[in-house]
């Protein structure tokens, strides 16, 4: 039986050395956990992680995390702490350079993230901050027929005319506070209209509380003149800018 339904492959050597003290009702753990030469690929994630080296030191009610991994030829690191003394808390820092992201057939990209994550699982609070640089990417025009994605068990279907915020509040969603800056480098290309269109720009992405959609501020534009084929004609595209000042899916 698969470890998880959407896990394509998983490998590595996991070891633990430590001791247990305290009482049956209040055990205390101390020890070291190591993952050597780990790897994982999941159909739900656009990354295949390889060469995962992870070390965690568990000291009673707290654990530290130090790890490194590869995605393509890019290198990433993951550090942080997990504390479960009172209200459990997870604090992580993700850094990387030229990590390979691939969501076939729509996008292949290299990303350089610097992200901090703070999670309070019992309170359902999540804070996400940082920046993601995209020095290189190839974005393809989606096909006319979009592949079907199965609905997960926690999805709530919102019918037309229903109050989305009220439904979200009744479902007790996570309180998310996200602030991310995304910058496009000079090798980001959109492939469509029988042309390769170079893009450039920056977006500030944010989400607050029970908001139903991520918001964006910034602009993405064509960085140089190109020739495209659209509406049955060959056209010169001199200038095009998509400006964002609201819901991410609704640029102007």
What are these regions (language model features)?
Residues 2-4:
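Short acidic, glycine/proline-rich loop/turn micro-motifs
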Residues 6-17, 36-43, 47-252:
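Strand-loop-strand
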Residues 27-33, 128:
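Short flexible loop/turn segments that cap and initiate beta-strands
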């Amino acid at each position: 039986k698969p470890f998880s339904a959407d896990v394509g492959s998983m490998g590595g050597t996991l070891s633990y050395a430590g001791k247990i003290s305290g009482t049956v009702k209040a055990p205390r753990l101390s020890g070291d956990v190591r993952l050597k030469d780990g790897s994982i690929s999941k159909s739900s994630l656009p990354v295949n992680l390889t060469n995962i080296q992870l070390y965690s030191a568990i000291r009673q009610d707290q654990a530290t995390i130090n790890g490194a991994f590869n995605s393509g030829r890019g290198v990433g690191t993951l550090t942080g702490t997990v504390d479960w003394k009172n209200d459990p808390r997870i604090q992580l820092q993700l850094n990387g350079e030229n990590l390979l992201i691939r969501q076939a057939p729509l996008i292949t990209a290299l990303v350089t993230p610097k992200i901090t994550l703070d999670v309070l699982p019992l309170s359902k609070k999540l804070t996400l901050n940082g920046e993601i640089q995209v020095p290189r990417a190839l974005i393809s025009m989606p096909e006319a027929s979009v592949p079907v994605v199965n609905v997960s068990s926690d999805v709530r279907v919102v019918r037309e005319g229903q109050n989305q915020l009220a439904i979200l509040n009744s479902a007790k969603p996570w309180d998310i506070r996200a602030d991310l800056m995304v910058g496009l480098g000079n090798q980001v290309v959109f492939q469509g209209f029988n042309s390769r269109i170079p893009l450039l720009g920056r977006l500030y992405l944010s989400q607050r509380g029970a908001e139903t959609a991520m918001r964006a501020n910034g602009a993405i534009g064509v960085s140089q003149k190109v020739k495209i084929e659209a509406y049955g004609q060959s056209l010169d595209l001199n200038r095009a800018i998509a400006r964002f000042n609201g819901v991410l899916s609704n640029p102007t």
